[in-house]
């Protein structure tokens, strides 16, 4: 399991505030929250891209700066960069080389699954955003890393590809775990058993019904202020119309 203890991150303000949480094996955990709430910073700290101001992150006895930890985690960031000078296949081979249990013999099958067979040997500079996202998902799955962490993994995917990826993640839960940031209600509804809400620097389990999640987010101070503005604007517009 991934264990986070007393994680804090300070920039000019406190972004993450003493977060302690455990992500068990063989489940999909979904993190939701408004923009700027610290979700991306949280995952960046977990995988070691950013150093926390305080706190520790472990998988079993392996610290997140250790090689054994890194071999067990695959991270799909929201603002990923893929090298334009590589083909899709070259990139997959390059990434999977650092994972000792990677399924290299399944690469062709997954390019076909994600409708990228014809693009396999084309340069990544010719790929659309959605195609690049598919390549990242293929790499994550074929890495056989026990933990896949993803920031808005489903952005840029069409509805069919989203459903295929959901089914794929579900099929892998016997030996894989996923921690995903998402605002996509399709994803939240599919994986509604393990939802975490990021708000005011805290990450807490959401125990209500998924239908209550929207109301919970709307109670966030910055969102509430925006809703108040909308209501005032609508009232003003009605008065002008009269």
Regions from the language model: what does each represent?
Residues 32-34:
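The feature captures the beta-strand-to-loop junction immediately N-terminal to the Walker
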Residues 47:
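Helix-to-loop junction immediately C-terminal to a conserved catalytic motif
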Residues 55-69:
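Conserved ABC transporter NBD signature motif
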Residues 93, 104-119, 141:
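Conserved ABC ATPase "signature" region
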Residues 159-161:
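Helix N-cap at the start of a conserved alpha-helix in ABC-type nucleotide-binding domains
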Residues 184-190:
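Conserved H-loop
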Residues 202-227:
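Conserved beta-strand-loop-alpha-helix hinge in the C-terminal portion
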């Amino acid at each position: 399991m991934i264990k986070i203890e007393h994680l804090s991150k300070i920039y000019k303000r406190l972004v993450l505030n003493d977060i302690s949480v455990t992500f068990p094996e063989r489940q999909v955990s979904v993190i939701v929250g408004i923009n700027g709430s610290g979700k991306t910073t949280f995952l960046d700290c977990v995988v070691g891209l950013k150093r926390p101001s305080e706190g520790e992150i472990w998988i079993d006895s392996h610290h997140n700066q250790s090689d054994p930890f890194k071999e067990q985690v695959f991270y799909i960031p929201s603002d990923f960069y893929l090298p334009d000078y590589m083909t899709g296949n070259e990139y997959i081979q390059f990434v999977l080389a650092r994972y000792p249990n990677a399924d290299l013999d399944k690469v062709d099958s997954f390019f076909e699954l994600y409708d990228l067979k014809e693009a396999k040997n084309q340069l990544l500079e010719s790929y659309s955003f959605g195609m690049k996202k598919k390549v990242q998902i293929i790499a994550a799955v074929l890495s056989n890393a026990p933990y896949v962490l993803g920031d808005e993994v489903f952005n840029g995917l069409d509805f069919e590809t989203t459903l295929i990826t959901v089914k794929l993640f579900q099929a892998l839960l016997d030996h894989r775990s996923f921690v995903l940031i998402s605002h996509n209600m399709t994803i939240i509804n599919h994986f509604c058993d393990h939802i975490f809400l990021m708000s005011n620097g805290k990450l807490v389990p959401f125990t209500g019904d998924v239908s209550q999640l929207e109301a919970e987010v709307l109670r966030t101070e910055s969102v509430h202020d925006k809703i108040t503005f909308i209501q005032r604007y609508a009232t003003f517009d009605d008065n002008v119309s009269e």
